[in-house]
């Protein structure tokens, strides 16, 4: 039986729509590509440097325990905090700043920043920026999207406001079979880390105790491998002023 031209056209439209949707989904979760501005999952460098980053919170109790570990090991980290959590726990944010760490913006509500209006995106970021300033943080505020999700409007806003999208290339506690065991988290991190890596850990909530337990082992293990720890800002400085003999540049299409 002959298929009418109208049916054929409809099928083509459906197939095209599916393809576009699939492509948009893939792009939205990519840690290495976006339509506007710079996205930084890591930096390419020969230097054995890494950035240790923590998402969510700040959470009373956990924050103090984590700061104690970092202080003991002499490591500075970058905390991508949720605005609503910071608003409830502003003193925790002040403790992070007082200890010499960086505060980054992880939006106010931690909603996926796709299919959102420009005004919503702007409000989520600017509201959290204001809270970060209230916590006493005065340096550049870096941004990481919740779940790493972005499509068009978020990267456009960040580009327009001269911000890079900070993602990551090592996230051990995203795998359930690894996240349940601190030793596995440590082993996975040591295996996957390379010069210029940005490590992401989630330690701020109940159920993430194993991730918190893994922090010291990760630091000790990487130090033993010759790595030093930098904040995200310090990693980006390597891009601006690469030391003699080193190569440092934004990754493209990794």
Residue ranges of model-derived segments:
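N-terminal Lys/Arg-rich, disordered targeting/topogenic segments
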Residues: 1-6
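Hydrophobic membrane-insertion alpha-helices, especially the h-region
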Residues: 9-24
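Active-site beta->alpha N-cap acidic-glycine motif
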Residues: 28-116, 120, 124-127, 131, ...
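C-terminal domain-boundary segment and adjacent tail
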Residues: 35-46, 72-74, 87, 209-254
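A cross-domain feature marking catalytic cores of carbohydrate-active enzymes
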Residues: 54, 81-83, 105-107, 145-147, ...
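CE4/NodB-like, metal-dependent polysaccharide N-deacetylase domain
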Residues: 67-76, 102, 118-152, 156-160, ...
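A short acidic, helix-capping loop that chelates divalent metal ions and anchors anionic groups
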Residues: 111-116, 174-176, 201-202
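His/Asp/Glu-enriched short active-site or ligand-binding loop at hydrolase and phosphoryl-transfer sites
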Residues: 149, 155-192, 226-238
């Amino acid at each position: 039986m002959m298929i009418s031209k109208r049916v054929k056209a409809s099928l083509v439209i459906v197939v095209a729509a599916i393809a576009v949707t699939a492509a948009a989904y893939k792009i939205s979760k990519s840690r290495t590509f976006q339509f506007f501005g710079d996205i930084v999952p890591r930096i390419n460098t020969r230097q054995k440097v890494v950035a240790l980053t923590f998402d969510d919170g700040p959470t009373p109790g956990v924050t103090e325990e984590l700061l104690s570990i970092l202080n003991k090991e002499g490591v500075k980290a970058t905390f991508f905090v949720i605005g609503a959590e910071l608003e409830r726990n502003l003193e925790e944010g002040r403790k992070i700043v007082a200890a010499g760490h960086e505060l980054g913006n992880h939006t106010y509500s931690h909603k996926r920043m796709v299919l959102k209006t420009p005004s919503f995106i702007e409000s989520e970021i600017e509201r959290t920026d204001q809270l970060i300033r209230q916590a006493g943080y005065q340096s550049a505020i870096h941004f990481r999207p919740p779940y790493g999700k972005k499509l068009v409007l978020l990267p456009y806003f960040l580009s327009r406001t001269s911000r890079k999208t900070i993602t990551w290339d090592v996230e051990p506690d995203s795998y359930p079979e690894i996240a349940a065991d601190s030793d596995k988290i440590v082993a996975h991190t040591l295996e996957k880390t390379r010069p210029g890596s940005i490590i992401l850990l989630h330690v701020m909530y109940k159920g993430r105790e194993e991730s918190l337990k893994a922090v010291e082992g990760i630091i000790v293990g990487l130090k033993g491998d010759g790595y030093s720890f930098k904040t995200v800002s310090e990693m980006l400085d390597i891009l601006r002023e690469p030391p003699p003999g080193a190569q440092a540049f934004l990754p493209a299409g990794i």
